[in-house]
A protein has these predicted regions:
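Catalytic core of non-heme Fe(II) oxygenases with the double-stranded beta-helix
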Residues: 106-151
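Extended, compositionally biased low-complexity polar/Lys-Gly-rich tracts
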Residues: 39, 46, 50-51, 56, ...
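A generic structural micro-feature
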Residues: 13, 99-101, 124-129
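Contiguous hydrophobic segments
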Residues: 3-4, 8, 101, 146-147
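Non-heme Fe(II)/2-oxoglutarate
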Residues: 1-96, 115-118
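A short coil-to-beta-strand element that immediately follows conserved catalytic motifs
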Residues: 91-107
């Protein structure tokens, strides 16, 4: 698990630790190719039963985190997840004596379009230390056209 490298930032908020990263173009392209293929598959599996938002124009699909196109992405989120846990523990309780291993349990996509709504929410996890993340691979032009914060 040592070939994937990514710069990221840790944001400490009063009751939250927020991690942020910008993925490489290669990784985003691999994700988008996988997702485009997934959308075209007749046997795609809907993940909509767990949906919090109102996605009427798009879909929520189960992704195979072991798929070759997702290998680097899956490895990266596991590395970042382990680092997140390490930073959280070191800042809130006693630091761990050993690094934790993070494994991907579920991965899904939310394909949203105009009129769809997916509010900020949290996810239940199968373990006490379960974590989740969000990744945007395509951003609507009207969002990109907005002024950048702080400028």
């Amino acid at each position: 698990m040592s070939e994937v490298r990514q710069e990221y930032k840790m944001h400490s908020l009063p009751a939250v630790f927020l991690m942020e990263a910008t993925l490489s173009d290669e990784m985003v392209n691999d994700l988008n190719e996988y997702l485009d293929d997934l959308l075209n598959q007749e046997d795609r599996v809907s993940h909509a039963g767990t949906l919090v938002g109102q996605i009427g124009n798009g879909e929520q699909l189960t992704m195979d985190h072991n798929h070759p196109k997702l290998g680097k992405f899956n490895e990266l989120i596991q590395i970042m997840g382990a680092d997140y846990v390490k930073n959280f523990a070191g800042s809130t309780v006693n630091p761990f004596k050993e690094n934790r291993v993070v494994e991907t349990d579920e991965l899904w996509s939310v394909h949203s379009y105009a009129g769809d709504y997916n509010p900020i929410h949290d996810h239940g996890t199968k373990t006490l230390m379960g974590i989740s993340c969000t990744c945007w691979t395509k951003v609507p032009q009207q969002i990109l056209d907005q002024p950048t914060s702080g400028t």
